[in-house]
């Protein structure tokens, strides 16, 4: 044990993974960190393996993916692991953010951890979009065309930026090459950000807990207690992931992407992957192109303002009935946006999307501050002598 505490590298591992004192009362909702680290590890290993057989060329990209599926030993397994773990990654990140919002993990002194987490979400979305373009099916081509064209909404220089991203006048070889290079690079940036996220949490006050109070009264070392606890959810995760990979690998994908990209034929509906749908719905609900793009990016960055707009004296919503109702309405609204993002742009989905978009932003900028002030007043009234 002595080398663990004296070796310059091992003592860092020891302080984070072995001796790290965790609050004794943290629930399974605090297990997402290990699951997300596992997802990132799977994505990097399977991604590097796929890159060994992939060709980033307009003529060969689709065929190289088919070659991986048919000719490479267990290539189908590597590809389906990569695709389905991406979905699992986002599902767990959304749960992780939901837990953070519920238990007030964004409040001081964890504000930096929360800000880095929001940057991680943005980088994840960029990485996922770049990866979705690479198989070069119909949805890849048209998704890339639509999303990169958003840059043309920027006044004066927009069209130049789009052509700079494409490396030409449409999605072509240069586009696929640069998307492949960036898609390969960004997971390593993600790993660095995840490390920063961990350091920011570890070097302030450590993990929060379901009571929202200081955890210093009762703590346990990370090993073996929380390692075993993490293993429980890791095994459950592998079981669920295996069900998707082996029995329904394309359940979360789009059948249109099994059709080779054809610039002369537009698919019936251009829809991104399910985990980007809520933000796509916000983009589409605003008729003005520039305002739609601003709203879509603001929807992600709105998470950053939570430490400022939540004026409550209590951490988390577990003991605040009004905030709890507001939180569950927000979650339901997010799921509604996810559904609307997959629908055609027609009545009543346009109107529903606009209502949901207003409600989404109102939650961060109006509902949270107003409700927290009301609850502060009620607490003061109740505790006044």
Swiss-Prot record:
Binding site for a ubiquinone: 202
Positions that bind heme b b566: 96, 197
Membrane topology, record value: Multi-pass membrane protein
Required cofactor names: heme b
Binding site for heme b b562: 82, 183
Cofactor note: Binds 2 heme b groups non-covalently.
Tree of life domain: Eukaryota
Transmembrane segments: 32-52, 76-98, 113-133, 179-199, 226-246, 290-310, 322-342, 349-369
Location of this chain's protein in the cell: Mitochondrion inner membrane
Keyword Transmembrane attributed: yes
One GO molecular-function entry: ubiquinol-cytochrome-c reductase activity
InterPro entries: Cyt_b/b6_C, Cyt_b/b6_C_sf, Cyt_b/b6_N, Cytb/b6-like_sf, Cytochrome_b, Cytochrome_b_C_euk/bac, Cytochrome_b_N_euk/bac, Di-haem_cyt_TM
UniProt keyword Transmembrane helix, yes or no: yes
GO cellular component terms, A-Z: mitochondrial inner membrane; respiratory chain complex III
The entry's keywords: Electron transport, Heme, Iron, Membrane, Metal-binding, Mitochondrion, Mitochondrion inner membrane, Respiratory chain, Transmembrane, Transmembrane helix, Transport, Ubiquinone
GO biological process: mitochondrial electron transport, ubiquinol to cytochrome c
Main localization of the protein described in the UniProt heading: mitochondrion
Function of the protein: Component of the ubiquinol-cytochrome c reductase complex (complex III or cytochrome b-c1 complex) that is part of the mitochondrial respiratory chain. The b-c1 complex mediates electron transfer from ubiquinol to cytochrome c. Contributes to the generation of a proton gradient across the mitochondrial membrane that is then used for ATP synthesis.
Leftover remarks: Heme 1 (or BL or b562) is low-potential and absorbs at about 562 nm, and heme 2 (or BH or b566) is high-potential and absorbs at about 566 nm.
Quaternary structure (record): Fungal cytochrome b-c1 complex contains 10 subunits; 3 respiratory subunits, 2 core proteins and 5 low-molecular weight proteins. Cytochrome b-c1 complex is a homodimer.
Family affiliation: Belongs to the cytochrome b family.
UniProt name for this protein: Cytochrome b
Organism: Aspergillus tubingensis
Gene: cob
